[in-house]
């Protein structure tokens, strides 16, 4: 497979994973924080096994100088997941996903301050178009302001987009850190961050998991992460 075809295939897989996570989460009868914890733990474990299978050494020294940013990225990732999964409980998967797609807009707006990139007229036009689309997705032009539950879902999805934009920005700074190791640390940190939050907010004794839910959790941790 030539590099161009491989790149296109990778992009298709990434977009498919990115756009279908909400459908899977809908059918997992667990709190969003539990799903986020399992997703991080399973994802980190899968990458570790992948490195072992490929007989690739874990590059600790490459991570050491960037450890603080990696930890921060993992923390942001955990809040990104929680807010997105919570959004699915208040609005439709389609609406939450479209709001989540505002993340590149936030990255573009922050780029002049973080990366000294020029905010061109073309970029501003794209941002304006995205914002107009966001207004139409919210349903305001057709039915006025959304109901409280729907509005909460939209706001949670937008908060998730902000967190995701922060994660994208940090990963741009960490672009020279090996991909597998970087992602593994970020996922592990996100999972660890979720533990105290779950202990404080979730009655774990009342949790139940169906076989279908367990399968979807594993798929979410491996494919969607």
Where are these regions (language model features)?
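Specific alpha-helical transmembrane segments that line the substrate/conduction pathway
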Residues: 34-37, 41-45, 85-118, 160
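Glycine-/small-residue-enriched transmembrane alpha-helix faces in small-molecule transporters
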Residues: 1-45, 75, 83, 146-173, ...
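Specific transmembrane alpha-helical segments of multi-pass solute transporters/efflux pumps
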Residues: 55-95, 100, 136, 221-225
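Loop-to-transmembrane alpha-helix entry segments
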Residues: 97-100, 116-136, 147-154, 207, ...
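Hydrophobic/small/kink-forming positions within alpha-helical transmembrane segments
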Residues: 19, 41, 48, 74, ...
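Cytoplasmic-side transmembrane-helix entry/capping segments in multi-pass membrane proteins
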Residues: 8, 65-71, 119-131, 153-154, ...
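Membrane-interface helix-cap regions at the ends of transmembrane helices
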Residues: 23, 44-63, 132-148, 189-213
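Hydrophobic transmembrane alpha-helices of multi-pass small-molecule transport proteins
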Residues: 47, 51, 71, 119-141, ...
């Amino acid at each position: 497979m030539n590099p161009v075809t491989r790149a296109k295939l990778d992009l298709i897989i990434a977009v498919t994973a990115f756009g279908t996570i909400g459908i899977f989460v809908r059918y997992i009868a667990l709190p969003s924080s539990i799903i986020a914890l399992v997703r991080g733990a399973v994802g980190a474990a899968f990458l570790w096994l992948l490195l072992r299978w490929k007989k690739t050494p874990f590059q600790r020294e490459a991570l050491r100088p960037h450890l603080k940013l990696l930890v921060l990225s993992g923390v942001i990732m955990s809040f990104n997941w929680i807010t997105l999964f919570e959004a699915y409980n208040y609005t439709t998967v389609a609406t939450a996903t479209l709001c989540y797609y505002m993340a590149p807009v936030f990255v573009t707006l922050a780029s002049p301050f973080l990366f000294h990139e020029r905010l061109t007229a073309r970029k501003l036009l794209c941002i304006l178009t995205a914002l107009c689309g966001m207004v139409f997705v919210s349903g305001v032009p057709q039915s006025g302001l959304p109901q409280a539950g729907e509005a909460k879902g939209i706001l949670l999805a937008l908060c998730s987009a902000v967190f995701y934009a922060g994660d994208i920005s940090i990963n741009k700074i960490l672009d020279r850190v090996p991909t597998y190791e970087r992602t593994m640390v970020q996922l592990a940190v996100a999972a660890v961050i979720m533990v105290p939050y779950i202990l404080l907010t979730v009655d774990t004794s009342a949790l139940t998991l169906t076989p279908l839910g367990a399968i979807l959790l594993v798929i979410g941790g491996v494919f969607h992460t």
